[in-house]
C-alpha cells in the first residue's frame, strides 16, 4: 500500500503538499523514511530522471517529475509498481489542474495542504481490490515501467550523488550496450561474408581442377 506521499517543488525542494497513512497496526516507524524522502527531494534537479524507483529495504520510493513538481510516494516493496506510477500520474493530473499556475509563486511550505483530501481519496481507490483487477487497463495508459530507472536509496544518499548523475551513467551504459550490439552485428556480418568467400574460393578451385583434369 501507499504509506506516504509528498509533493515538492523541484527548484528549491519546497514541500507543497503531503499525506501520511496511519500505520499503527503494523507498528512500523516511518520517521526514517520521512527523513530519506526529504534528503531525496533535496537531490532532485532539472536533470533528474522524470520517473524513478528507489529501493529502501522492505519499502520503495517511486516518483514522477512533471512541470517542475515532484510527486513522491513511499510504498511497500510488494505494492505493484504499475499501480504506484498510475497513482502518481493521477495525482499529477489533478494537482496540476488545481494549482499548477500557483506553484511558481508560493513561498510558504505546504501551501496546498488541503490537497491531502484528494490524496487520501485516491489512495483508497488504488488499494481497493477492483483497482488491482483493473491493472491491465492501467498498463495500456502508462509509460513502460520497465524503462523506469531503479536505484538503491541508501547508495544514492550516502554517495551524495545527484540523481542526474545516475541518469547520466544509465544513459552511458545504454549507449555502450547499443554500441556493443552494433559491433557484434558488424562482426557477425563480416564472419558471414568471410565464410561465403571461402566457400566461393573452394568451389572455383574445384571447377578449375575438374576442367584441367578432363582436358
Curated annotation (Swiss-Prot):
**Which residue numbers delimit the v-SNARE coiled-coil homology domain?**
134-194
Q: Which sequence ranges are marked TM in the entry?
A: 191-213
Q: Which SUPFAM superfamilies match?
A: SNARE fusion complex (SSF58038), SNARE-like (SSF64356)
**Cellular component, GO, one term:** SNARE complex
Signal sequence, start to end: none
* Keyword vocabulary terms for this entry: Coiled coil, Endoplasmic reticulum, ER-Golgi transport, Golgi apparatus, Membrane, Protein transport, Transmembrane, Transmembrane helix, Transport
Pfam families under this entry? Answer: Longin, Synaptobrevin
Where it sits in the cell: the answer is: Endoplasmic reticulum membrane; Endoplasmic reticulum-Golgi intermediate compartment membrane; Golgi apparatus, cis-Golgi network membrane; Golgi apparatus, trans-Golgi network membrane
The record's section on Gene3D superfamilies has:
1.20.5.110, Longin domain
Query: Per the record, what ranges lie on the membrane's Cytoplasmic side?
Result: 1-190
Ranges where the Longin domain occurs? 6-119
- Tell me what topology the record assigns in the membrane: Single-pass type IV membrane protein
Q: Which GO terms describe its biological process?
A: endoplasmic reticulum to Golgi vesicle-mediated transport; protein transport; retrograde vesicle-mediated transport, Golgi to endoplasmic reticulum; vesicle fusion with Golgi apparatus
Predominantly, its location class is endoplasmic reticulum
Provide the membrane-side ranges marked Lumenal in the record. 214-215
Q: Which GO terms describe its molecular function?
A: SNAP receptor activity
Q: Which family is this sequence assigned to? A: Belongs to the synaptobrevin family.
Q: How does it assemble?
A: Component of 2 distinct SNARE complexes.
As for what it does, the entry says: SNARE involved in targeting and fusion of ER-derived transport vesicles with the Golgi complex as well as Golgi-derived retrograde transport vesicles with the ER.
What is this protein's record name?
Vesicle-trafficking protein SEC22b-A
The species is Danio rerio
